[in-house]
Each structure stands twice: as structure tokens, then as C-alpha cells.
Curated annotation (Swiss-Prot):
InterPro entries: GP_PDE_dom (IPR030395), PLC-like_Pdiesterase_TIM-brl (IPR017946). Its EC number is 3.1.4.46. Residues 3-239 form the GP-PDE domain. Keywords: Calcium, Hydrolase, Magnesium, Metal-binding. This is Glycerophosphodiester phosphodiesterase. It comes from the Bacteria. Changing residue 112 to A: Retains 4.7% of activity.
Amino acid sequence: MKTLVIAHRGDSKNVPENTIAAFKRAMELGADGIELDVQLTKDGHLVVIHDETVDRTTNGEGFVKDFTLEEIKKLDAGIKFGEKFAGERIPTLYEVFELIGDKDFLVNIEIKSGIVLYPGIEEKLIKAIKEYNFEERVIISSFNHYSLRDVKKMAPHLKIGLLYQCGLVEPWHMALRMEAYSLHPFYFNIIPELVEGCKKNGVKLFPWTVDRKEDMERMIKAGVDGIITDDPETLINLVRKGG
């Protein structure tokens, strides 16, 4: 079975992360899907940005939660990446869904609900997914497993993926207990026991964030189901060559 190529925040190696331009580029390259992050604005809109503050990726300063949608849309999310990307904006989740349309394309949505908690984000996300008919094309992931538990309670049919960083023992048991579709470990944790345990128990495995060619080759050889990477072009070429 082919290893899925999931572009982390889009083609974030070459284009400003979590922007429409980055997602469009990932689609043009032939990625199987994208990974993106959602947070809530002050007035309750789902916006796509990784950090809890806008400082690193835009020309603004402050917490995402303190901006209204109108205010956050005035920020330049491309200028720090280079002049040619000036004018890129922080997209809403709806705008990303509109870009993808009815294409057979995976969207891994990470709920950012840790440093800043966003009460009600799960309900808003589920509503957006249903509204745009993305139920079969999304995996909702988070480091906050309470948030994922809430998603599963409200929408049992949606796929969830458990994000984690440390070397957990037999984590597929936790995945099965939570009725999770997948595990999303930091790629250093990929060992034969983990791959075998997941395969035996029907749990998909999507390690992150794999950017070096030699690590991509190791992940493909290990037999993971998909790879989350900042460099989708290199990974696509490797997968096409058979690893």
C-alpha cells in the first residue's frame, strides 16, 4: 500500500505555512493531503494558524484569541517569508474547504487547544466539516486528547488521531479505547514494535514531522501509513520511486 504524503501546513518548506498559497502548492505537487491547525478568533471564527500568537508568521503581535476575524485578516501572513508572498492572509477553515472543494484530498485538522483553551471549538469544527461535506476526508488530531474525546462524543463517525511526542508503550491500546483512527507520533518513536502493534490492531500510523530524505526513506521502509512533512515534493518523488 502506498505511503500517504501529508503536507505539513501545506508546502511549508517553500511557501508561507498555513496559507492558501501553501495548500494550493501542496495540491499542485500531488500530495495526498495537508495538515493544518485551527484556533478561534475573539469573535468565534475558525482560523488556520499554528502558533497561539501571530508574532512569528505575520507582521502583527498578540494572541490569536484577542483578534476579531476582521482584525486578523488585516495581517500579512506572507511578508516574513519573502516579498513575493506579501499580501498572503491567515485563512479561515471555510476558505481552505472551498479551495479543496469536492476533490479526493485528505485534511488533517489539528485542534490547538493547550496553551490557550478554546471552549466550543470542537462544536464549531464539527459544524464546518458537516457543512462542507468533509466527513470522509478529515482526520481531527490534537495533543489535547480531552478535546478529541469530546469530538468523538459529539460526532462518533469522525476520524480522530492522537498526537504525542514521547515514547509511549503500546499506545494502540489507548487508540482503541478512544476509538481513534490513527496515532500521530513524533517520528523518532517509530520502531518495529509500534508499527507491528498498530497494524495488528487496525490503527493507522502518521509520524511527524519528517523532513530529511534519509528519515523519509526509513519511515517508508518501516511501513507507516502516511508521513507528515514540510517537504512534500521530496517525499512524493521518493514514494513514486518506491522509497
